[in-house]
Design a protein with these regions (language model features):
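Ligand-binding loop in jelly-roll beta-barrel domains
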Residues: 14, 23-25, 35-38, 84-103, ...
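Glycine- and acidic-residue-biased ligand/ion/polar-headgroup-sensing regions
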Residues: 25-50, 54, 169-197
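Loop-centered beta-sheet repeat module
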Residues: 58-105
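Tight coil/turn sites that cap or link beta-strands
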Residues: 81-83, 91, 170-172, 180, ...
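C-terminal amphipathic alpha-helical segment
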Residues: 105-176
């Protein structure tokens, strides 16, 4: 959640081909839960850029003018490929799903300081080496929505690293069972109960669960929205 200030504008996650610190790149998805009027995200360049142009914009403070400003909508998902310069603007609350990687390069931080007058560490040279300088276009996903009597399932994002779906439940929903890899569940609205064989667990907003790759089905009951991610 970031309602008072923008988050680390200019964060860059490494692309796969240029991984250099024994880490994978970090593709991710932002699912907007709520936002203030006029809020949005920065994502990718408006047009093809060169390293020299970006470096000059960082020096003279005009870097924001090179980036796409995208007004957000509640309930919409935004896919951010690794290597894309990006940041969440203030007043935006998202559920963030990321490819597993600990590497982030901070390119710009609004010249902010902490209470001791210190600025956060930047990683400009590393970011310049791995960022995608091409013009960014927001990926468009084909709408895949299944409507049942007691729930609605909508695919939010699908890539080679993960698949995310929103389950809006008003009663009962049987969730997919996977045997090839684990999955995760995050409750972003409401509350309910999960059932797996003889086990049950109550949940509410903010709770998250890892589901092992046992192939055993899980049933969710309640009035809620769950984000299911399969790796």
């Amino acid at each position: 959640r970031d309602t008072d200030r923008s988050r680390g504008l200019g964060d860059v996650y490494k692309r796969q081909a240029l991984s250099r610190e024994n880490e994978y790149g970090k593709n991710e998805m932002w699912y907007v839960l709520e936002h203030e009027e006029g809020a949005g995200i920065y994502c990718g360049f408006k047009q093809d850029m060169t390293r020299e142009q970006v470096q000059e914009a960082l020096t003279d403070g005009s870097i924001l003018s090179l980036l796409n400003w995208i007004p957000v909508e509640d309930g919409k998902a935004y896919y951010i490929p690794a290597g894309t310069v990006h940041a969440i603007g203030k007043g935006v609350v998202v559920c963030e799903i990321q490819q597993s990687s600990n590497c982030t390069y901070r390119l710009y931080d609004y010249d902010r300081t902490d209470r001791y007058g210190n600025r956060r560490q930047l990683h400009v040279e590393k970011a310049l080496e791995v960022m995608d300088y091409h013009r960014y276009e927001l990926p468009q996903f084909q709408d895949e929505t299944v409507v049942k009597d007691t729930y609605t399932c909508r695919i939010l994002s699908r890539c080679k690293y993960f698949e995310c779906a929103s389950y809006q439940i008003h009663g009962t929903a049987e969730l997919p069972a996977y045997s090839d890899s684990f999955s995760s569940l995050v409750c972003v609205k409401g509350s309910g109960t999960l059932y797996k064989q003889d086990e049950k667990m109550q949940f509410s907003v903010g709770d998250s669960f890892f589901v092992p790759c046992s192939g055993e089905k899980i049933r969710a009951e309640g009035d809620c929205e769950l984000i299911l991610t399969h790796i």
